[in-house]
């Protein structure tokens, strides 16, 4: 049986961190055990582990797959001649950096070839840290890919995607995100002529929902709004290239079948998507600007309580009602390191220069805040309830310093005049007037 991945309507399972179960053929899931002597339909049982066996049950992530051919059936991998764009990490710089949107190549480019390394804070073999990429594509993948180096968080800015994975399919559009577990095989098909966006590669603990503390049991990203796929398989006996990223390098081998051949599965180590428009935004209804941690969608913790390996934070449409308050994000010097992107609209701390598809980097203790134009307007504004609308900025925040790639420091999209946006900040100090 070969299910057509071009079908328009997809079904999903709802919830975050659930023990899901799905089968594309009735009775394909074994009952009462994981690895029977003879699995239904002559399938192979295969365990897909996302954490160590001895993790606490609340932290453990694993999925049992029942597939036509096991993943072990492949020849040796060979290092590919064409590696990821971006080059090695560049020189260390404490400077604030901002990039205009990267151009989409004119030559045929799939998701893998369109990945460009921008910043990173650790080598891929370390069990912590993140790497950040841009992706640009103008054709669907014919290859299948998996990433041995970390979990992938995809943030589209332009163009719809269909992500065909071992466990089923996810359709993704701008203002939605997808998370793909480390090692999951997938193929990305374009549903529009071009696609562009951002990828955070999480080398640390898997992403999860942040604790809500005094907010209570509801708010921010609600678990029911996360969607996991249902089983879908390809029974294709044709040459297929399988590519993996291993310690930052691309390796490939040739199969005689599609590796997206899982007929049934159960577990919690699964891909999922989330619509950012469903985020329940929290904010002040009195005065001052709360810390931006109230906008956290997902977090990857470290061993230090409250210190994130990766926080994924958004700045969505919201009402601003604070009285006697400087309403834009305040001026800041941060222990954490902030890589920001923009999906649509404008960011309320920058009047111009920060464009959809662009990015900025403010490293540890790099002073930042609203630009001169935004600051002047905010100081003199008549404070009435106002809605920030038609916007979606986001931030990958991490506790380790992010180093730009050589490409990021040399590309023409780097805005060499970024510091000038603060040059027009007025001096309003007057010792004779309080």
UniProtKB/Swiss-Prot annotation:
Keyword Metal-binding assigned = yes
Q: Which reaction does it catalyse?
A: homogentisate + O2 = 4-maleylacetoacetate + H(+)
Record-annotated residues binding homogentisate?
347, 368
Q: Where does Fe cation bind?
A: 332, 338, 368
Which cysteine pairs make disulfide bonds?
Answer: none
The entry's cellular-component GO terms read:
cytoplasm
Under CDD domains, the record lists: cupin_HGO_N
Give EC number(s), comma-separated: 1.13.11.5
Q: Which family does it belong to?
A: Belongs to the homogentisate dioxygenase family.
Q: What is this protein called?
A: Homogentisate 1,2-dioxygenase
Q: Which organism is it from?
A: Pseudomonas fluorescens (strain ATCC BAA-477 / NRRL B-23932 / Pf-5)
